[in-house]
């Protein structure tokens, strides 16, 4: 059932839970997420980020996500994640995304406001919800270093990358954005060390603004950290890294087990369709697990 982002997030706010937002990189990830949604009976958000364009073009992603969203028996939003420009967001709207994110977080504050205002005006005219970002959410690299999320604009980083509650209040007031991604210590990717989360900051921001708050970099946190963040005001949690990692691990284990058995017996080979099914099942189980965590009420 295809719905807009605002509908899902307003429901999550009322219930004091969070909705999972899962990046889609191929047919199998969409299949896994929607199967998990139906089996748990919970709404989900499927989203596409341009960082995954080497694997899946945005136009193909839109067709895949819209197909699965319409045939799934629970509410599903189709979201553009980390739109880097006005033009990218407009492309998402034309392709049928029910919500878009304009990520101008690496721009100066006033420029972030102006670009977000432009996207909100155009998107709302098409009944499309808009998420924006304030603060700096970093991406973890394999060597342990970090890079800032968002678009390719190069600006000086502020001393405090976390979202300021008063700045968030003014940002939402001026932009009329439907959801706000905030920075409080999470990062995209795999954590090499335990993240230092300022969960109290989430509560402070929640007191200042009424729109749903979004957590990026959800993979790798504990159940307690997720649930405290939700209790403090998070309504949408982006999750992809570990879902993808578990799928790869399941496929690797199956191949290794088959190769070991083949050395001693007449073991049937592993075909590509076997790998696909194994990956879908592994992702589905992980998505079901985090959906249940996000949906637990206080």
Where are these regions (language model features)?
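Glycine-rich nucleotide/cofactor/substrate-binding loop typically near the N-terminus or early
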Residues: 80, 249, 258
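Extended, intrinsically disordered, low-complexity segments
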Residues: 255-298
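Glycine-rich beta-strand-to-loop/alpha-helix junction loops that act as flexible
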Residues: 185, 216-219
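Alpha/beta enzyme core
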Residues: 3-11, 26-51, 58-75, 83-208, ...
């Amino acid at each position: 059932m295809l719905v807009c982002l605002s509908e899902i997030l307003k429901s999550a706010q009322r219930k004091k839970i969070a909705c999972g937002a899962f990046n889609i990189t191929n047919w199998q990830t969409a299949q896994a997420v929607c199967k998990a949604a139906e089996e748990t009976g919970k709404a989900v958000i499927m989203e596409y980020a341009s960082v995954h364009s080497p694997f899946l073009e945005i136009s193909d992603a839109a067709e895949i996500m819209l197909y699965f969203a319409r045939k799934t028996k629970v509410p599903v939003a189709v979201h553009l994640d980390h739109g880097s420009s006005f033009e990218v967001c407009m492309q998402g709207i034309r392709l049928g995304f029910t919500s878009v994110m304009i990520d101008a977080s690496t721009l100066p504050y006033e420029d972030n406001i102006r670009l977000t205002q432009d996207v909100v005006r155009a998107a709302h005219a098409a009944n499309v919800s808009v998420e924006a970002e304030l603060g700096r959410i970093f991406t973890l690299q394999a060597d342990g270093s970090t890079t800032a999320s968002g678009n390719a604009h190069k600006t000086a980083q502020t001393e405090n990358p976390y979202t300021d509650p008063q700045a968030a209040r003014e940002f939402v007031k001026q932009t009329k954005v439907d959801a706000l991604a905030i920075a409080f210590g999470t990062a995209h990717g795999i954590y090499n060390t335990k993240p230092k989360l300022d969960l109290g900051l989430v509560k402070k921001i929640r007191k200042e603004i009424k729109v749903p708050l979004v957590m990026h970099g959800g993979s790798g946190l504990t159940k307690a950290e997720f649930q405290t963040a939700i209790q403090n005001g998070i309504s949408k949690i982006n999750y992809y890294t570990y879902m993808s990692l578990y799928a790869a691990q399941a496929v690797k284990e199956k191949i290794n087990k088959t190769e070991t058995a083949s050395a001693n017996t007449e073991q049937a080979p592993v075909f590509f369709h076997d790998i696909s099914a194994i990956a879908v099942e592994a992702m589905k189980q992980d998505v079901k697990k985090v959906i249940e965590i996000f949906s637990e009420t206080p």
